[in-house]
Design a protein with these regions (language model features):
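Active-site acidic/histidine proton-transfer and metal-coordination neighborhood
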Residues: 17-20, 24, 34-124, 184, ...
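A short, acidic, amphipathic alpha-helical segment used as a generic capping/interface helix at domain edges
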Residues: 178-192
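Acidic/histidine-rich catalytic cores of soluble enzymes
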Residues: 84-180
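Conserved, mostly hydrophobic/aromatic
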Residues: 18, 52, 94, 128, ...
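C-terminal helical cap(s) of enzyme catalytic domains, especially alpha/beta-barrels
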Residues: 211-232
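Glycine-rich, proline-tolerant flexible connector loops at the mouths of alpha/beta enzymes
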Residues: 1-15, 67
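Conserved beta-strand positions in the central sheet of alpha/beta enzyme cores
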Residues: 27, 61, 95, 151-154, ...
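Active-site beta-loop-alpha junctions enriched in small/polar residues
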Residues: 1-2, 30-33, 65-67, 99-101, ...
Length: 232
């Protein structure tokens, strides 16, 4: 709710909580818009890398410009090359997340993968089941995405009935039997192709801020159970 990575906790408090509860902090969000090559973006990147390092996070997410402006592939490739040395300096992994929104400058996971390879940087893909659903060509391109290049998968659900091009982050909830994203099917398809990595829930709906601890526990357990039943 605070808009800060650690809310009102110090870096040391976060580290101590992680040790106490045996939690590994895999990633924090996010460099935006990573494919705008500016001093402001570079400073934001360095600030978030310091934050990730301070709390012991392993990775930092990079999200593309999402305002309807076109960004040439060459510009995105250059941005990857510009930022990679910073990630290396701080010892943090980069996760590039294509955004499926119609106004996104990088919607395709396959294109993102190609740009990462062409830039010769050690970043990996972050696949999000919501954004996979929003991008019309995602299913057709799925077979071209190398599973070994995927570093993390974000999961959420949408029950809202409006067309996919009208969906926003505000409709993203935990998983239910009425999920329109096909998140369980996406997880099963990734596992069938050998994805050995981590899945993480990323709902955004405003009502989540009102949930109690019991609500959070129930929703996580129900979502995990849905995935396990589907992938059994």
């Amino acid at each position: 709710p605070s808009g800060k990575v650690t809310d009102d906790l110090s870096h040391q408090q976060v580290r101590e909580l992680a040790v106490r509860y045996h939690i590994e902090i895999l990633t924090i969000n996010a460099v935006y818009p990573f494919n705008r090559r500016s001093e402001e973006v570079r400073q934001l990147t360095e600030s978030l890398l310091k934050e990730a390092q301070a709390i012991g996070a392993k990775s930092l997410v990079l999200c593309p410009l999402n305002d309807g402006s076109e960004v040439p592939a060459s510009e995105t490739l250059g941005a990857l090359r510009d930022l990679a040395p910073l990630f290396a300096f701080y010892g943090i992994h980069g996760l590039v997340e294509p955004l499926g929104f119609p106004q996104s400058s990088l919607r395709s996971a396959h294109q993102a993968q190609t740009l990462i390879h062409d830039a010769r940087v050690p970043f990996k893909l972050l696949i999000d089941t919501f954004h996979h659903h929003l991008y019309p060509q995602a299913a057709d391109e799925f077979s071209q995405v190398e599973v070994a290049d995927i570093g993390l998968v974000h999961l959420s659900g949408v029950d809202d009935s409006r067309p996919r091009e009208q969906l926003t982050d505000a409709e993203r909830i935990m998983l239910t039997p009425k999920d329109r994203l096909g998140t369980c099917e996406q997880v099963k398809a990734l596992e069938a192709r050998g994805y050995p990595g981590v899945d993480a829930f990323e709902p955004f709906a405003p009502e989540l801020a009102q949930w109690s601890e019991a609500d959070i526990e129930r929703e996580i357990e129900q979502s995990i159970a849905l995935i396990q039943r589907h992938c059994a």
